[in-house]
Amino acid sequence: MLYKGDTLYLDWLEDGIAELVFDAPSSVNKLDTATVASLGEAIGVLEQQSDLKGLLLRSNKAAFIVGADITEFLSLFLVPEEQLSQWLHFANSVFNRLEDLPVPTIAAVNGYALGGGCECVLATDYRLATPDLRIGLPETKLGIMPGFGGSVRMPRMLGADSALEIIAAGKDVGADQALKIGLVDGVVKAEKLIEGAMAILRQAINGDLDWKAKRQPKLEPLKLSKIEATMSFTIAKGMVAQTAGKHYPAPITAVKTIEAAARFGREEALNLENKSFVPLAHTNEARALIGIFLNDQYVKGKAKKLTKDVETPKQAAVLGAGIMGGGIAYQSAWKGVPVVMKDINDKSLTLGMTEAAKLLNKQLERGKIDGLKLAGVISTIHPTLDYAGFDRVDVVVEAVVENPKVKKAVLAETEQKVRPDTVLASNTSTIPISELANALERPENFCGMHFFNPVHRMPLVEIIRGEKSSDETIAKVVAWASKMGKTPIVVNDCPGFFVNRVLFPYFAGFSQLLRDGADFRKIDKVMEKQFGWPMGPAYLLDVVGIDTAHHAQAVMAAGFPQRMQKDYRDAIDALFDANRFGQKNGLGFWHYKEDSKGKPKKEEDAAVDDLLAEVSQPKRDFSEEEIIARMMIPMVNEVVRCLEEGIIATPAEADMALVYGLGFPPFHGGAFRWLDTLGSAKYLDMAQQYQHLGPLYEVPEGLRNKARHNEPYYPPVEPARPVGDLKTA
């Protein structure tokens, strides 16, 4: 053994060839600060070996290196910029020394090589991969950019265009694509990986492969003519501006850094990467996006822990076809759980099957599946007008009309047709689960399962625990949601549950602004362009359906009369009474026409202003700050109440439900992350300016306490040890 660290070791393989093996004590290899230091020590040992002829890098895990240790980021990024820069210089000196070894090097890459894992293998001369490879640089999705030389080596290896596509978008690619663009030199079966890598290494040692020529471009300026550079970087900057926008500084910073570094050799280019990385690491956007990553891990880990002792349902059923039922059936079948889809109406069944077929055909058009796979999936969806096959199902989700009487009748009838251990769930969006459970003989086998539309796109599923729902019932439904590729979050029961309960105060803020003379077009523009929502409230209401919102608004008002009962006729009432239901009938806040692709395109409609004039004061202008405050305060207050009342368990779950269920702007990180960034005292000052608008603007006592003691909702993160104290040699 040449060297043994906590997460890697170095040993001789055969005559003059050494292997450096990543083998962390945990289930995966991560490139944390300790591993970077160990790598430096191992390379120091290699540099002393006069008889060294070649080096093989490999992993003892199912994945090579999954990336840096993201849990370290929040504390590491709190150290002063100068110290962070110093540590990055050290880390890059380690990879430079790996790259500068006087012998050929190869990485045998299996599974994931992401972020720092990808940057590590970019420093070797050759890369051989297995078919399960996923390799790339996802840093911009975390609000940062590659910091271990990825923005320097990748463009010089692949050319600017391919590298920019991966780095700016935070992409990873599979084995075939990696081979095609030159990110790896070959792909072999897993059992042949080491044998194949050794064969390449021997060829390089023997002089059959010119490893020095392979290494040289990574040390030099990027080989691009002035015209090529102008085209590549102009197109990349345009694409980034269009897709990322102003709220995500990392992608455009990465592109500009690669452009600026193009004319320099490795050392100066790495200095430019360092200078760009450090300020990004200190942005609120990076903290928010890293927070989302960590929250996502927490939520998925919680679901995994919850379901460890239950069997995932093998056969499911959906009650109620149509668009929603068809979407649920598709998602279940697509992920391998056959489903019976029942409706009392043949036309609805046809609509549900058409929806599932349409979604599968889209996968076919994109080349994700072939005709055989399509036929196989669709054959596992069984439409029926009766209860045939229900005696075999493990779980049933009801997705009929949002009417408590209808839902109770359907659920009670279904309970008589299934096994005693079959779990029933309702896809209601607002009706309390405990109320629906009153119709059942086995309420312990019942819970809520709230999908979001469109089902195939929206990651969140709210799992609602009723008063009598058993732990096993919740676990089984969480297991099914996870199997469907969704992110399940368990919430406690109340009208609207979590997501709709906090959404309708937001809509109430919108209605009050309109009542007071604001223009809905400006509100939408501000909430989209300035705050960052994917849709403004008017557009969102049109997509949800004015009729749906009108009904849900009444349910929420009955559930929370003190705050949500309004004493005036609002814009939603006015549009509903005029039969303007949104996109579904082409008339809402906008007039909708289909474009050439059959998608609804919104157009101005003067009739709306006349309708709104009946329920509004004369038009007046509101500042962007006032619009944002009046829209967000009711929502954030309600989010805080949900945490205080135990409707949602943690700030992390609340923020993920908002991001995944409503599209809360990820660069804000969710309501609690936004609150922490703003500061609870500053938020309280802002909210008090609007408390005259009514109970929705009254700040909950728990939040007032936070403001008094200057306490955040997320545990405060301590800065990493001074970088000088980290192992840097």
UniProtKB/Swiss-Prot annotation:
InterPro entries xrefs: 3-OHacyl-CoA_DH_CS (IPR006180), 3-OHacyl-CoA_DH_NAD-bd (IPR006176), 3HC_DH_C (IPR006108), 6-PGluconate_DH-like_C_sf (IPR008927), ClpP/crotonase-like_dom_sf (IPR029045), Enoyl-CoA_hyd/isom_CS (IPR018376), Enoyl-CoA_hydra/iso (IPR001753), FA_oxidation_alpha_subunit (IPR050136)
PROSITE patterns per the UniProt record, alphabetical: 3HCDH (PS00067), ENOYL_COA_HYDRATASE (PS00166)
Keyword Oxidoreductase: yes
Record's catalysed reaction(s): a (3S)-3-hydroxyacyl-CoA + NAD(+) = a 3-oxoacyl-CoA + NADH + H(+); a (3S)-3-hydroxyacyl-CoA = a (2E)-enoyl-CoA + H2O; a 4-saturated-(3S)-3-hydroxyacyl-CoA = a (3E)-enoyl-CoA + H2O; (3S)-3-hydroxybutanoyl-CoA = (3R)-3-hydroxybutanoyl-CoA
Any one GO CC term of the record: fatty acid beta-oxidation multienzyme complex
Residues annotated to bind substrate: 296, 500, 660
Residues binding NAD(+): 324, 343, 400-402, 407, 429, 453
Site (Important for catalytic activity): 119, 139
Region (Disordered): 708-729
E.C. designation(s): 4.2.1.17, 5.1.2.3, 5.3.3.8, 1.1.1.35
Catalytic residue positions: 450
HAMAP family in UniProt: FadB
Family: In the N-terminal section; belongs to the enoyl-CoA hydratase/isomerase family. In the C-terminal section; belongs to the 3-hydroxyacyl-CoA dehydrogenase family.
Name of the featured protein: Fatty acid oxidation complex subunit alpha
Protein's gene: fadB
